[in-house]
A protein has these predicted regions:
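Residue-level signal for the short linker/turn that defines the boundary of a DNA-recognition helix
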Residues: 9-11, 51, 66, 222
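Mobile genetic element proteins and their domesticated derivatives, centered on retroelements
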Residues: 15-16, 26, 41, 56, ...
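Basic, flexible linker segments flanking DNA-binding modules
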Residues: 2-4, 20-106, 197-198, 251-261, ...
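C-terminal domain-tail junction helix/linker
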Residues: 186-188, 209-288
């Protein structure tokens, strides 16, 4: 159509009449190839089956600069709309859990709850390093909207470094748009366990069991301030005074410090070897 308009200098109406096609068809412009977007959207939908197009758009906008209208259109064309059922859980296969070899490869999150003597309910938000078993944060508050969750995580990152991934359940605080956008910004992989499968976050479940058995069930909290004080004291004892059988009966803090010392020593040895190799290579090149 455009070629005819340019070649014969005719009007759009005249050309459409001669070709017997509607003017709307004459104005049609083919869309860009969406195959790359479709493939990535299918992949993201498999990884996050309970995410709608708005949350999936956060990934695609970050990776490809795609606007939300295009994501919505392609999402609907692919038939990826999330079903609104609550009785059945959509199960998905998790990747086999990798063997952890260093701190900050994976953190684990979960919540516990209790009540003060005055009847005020509160929640406890815990953060663990799955390798060192250290409790990195144990925050007490009456509620944990997603912005408070990310604030706690950023303080933990400032103290311990950034994790590669975070394992958690599918609670609303941990699947919100804000939390997802925060993880994308920080380049942290989110590992959401399957609904009804708490054993997929076994380390955190074990920690929560100890927290309840040794602190929440045995302490009388007069108010939130008292709860924060007693739970913080329990966290210190858990990290620095209690040996762990899987850590050769070292405390979690001892294990983390010894790992860091060994890692630093190994790095220095490798640097020394590299300098020696560079010196030998340089000497060999100077020989006649």
């Amino acid at each position: 159509m455009r070629r005819l308009l340019e070649e014969f200098k005719a009007s759009e109406r005249h050309v459409c009449e001669l070709m017997a096609v509607p003017r709307s068809s004459g104005r049609y412009r083919s869309r860009r190839d969406d195959r790359r977007i479709e493939e990535r959207l299918r992949e993201l939908a498999r990884e996050h089956p309970r995410f709608g197009y708005r949350r999936l758009h956060l990934y695609l906008h970050k990776e490809m600069g795609v606007n939300h209208k295009k994501v919505q259109r392609v999402y609907r064309e692919l038939g990826l709309s999330v079903k609104r059922t609550r009785r059945k859980h959509l199960r998905r296969a998790l990747q086999p859990r990798a063997v952890l070899t260093a701190p900050n490869q994976e953190w684990a999150l979960d919540f516990a709850s209790d009540v003060t003597a005055a009847g005020q309910r509160f929640r406890v938000f815990g953060v663990l390093d799955s390798f060192t078993r250290q409790c990195l944060a144990l925050e007490v508050a009456t509620s944990f909207p997603s912005r408070r969750v990310t604030s706690v995580l950023e303080r933990a990152i400032a103290a311990y470094g950034k994790p590669q991934s975070i394992r958690s359940d599918n609670g609303p605080e941990l699947t919100s748009r804000h939390y997802l956008a925060w993880a994308i910004e920080w380049k942290i992989d989110l590992l959401h366990i399957q609904p009804g499968k708490p054993t997929q976050n076994g380390g955190m479940e074990s920690f929560n069991g100890k927290l309840r058995d040794e602190c929440l069930n045995t302490s009388w909290f007069w108010n939130l301030f008292d709860a924060r004080k007693k739970i913080s004291a329990w966290k210190t004892e858990y990290n620095s005074r209690r040996p762990h059988s899987s850590l050769a009966y070292r405390t979690r803090d001892e294990f983390a410090l010894q790992w860091q010392a060994a890692s630093l020593s190994e790095a220095k040895s490798m640097a020394r070897i590299s300098r020696v190799k560079a010196t030998l290579t340089g000497s060999a090149s100077l020989r006649p």
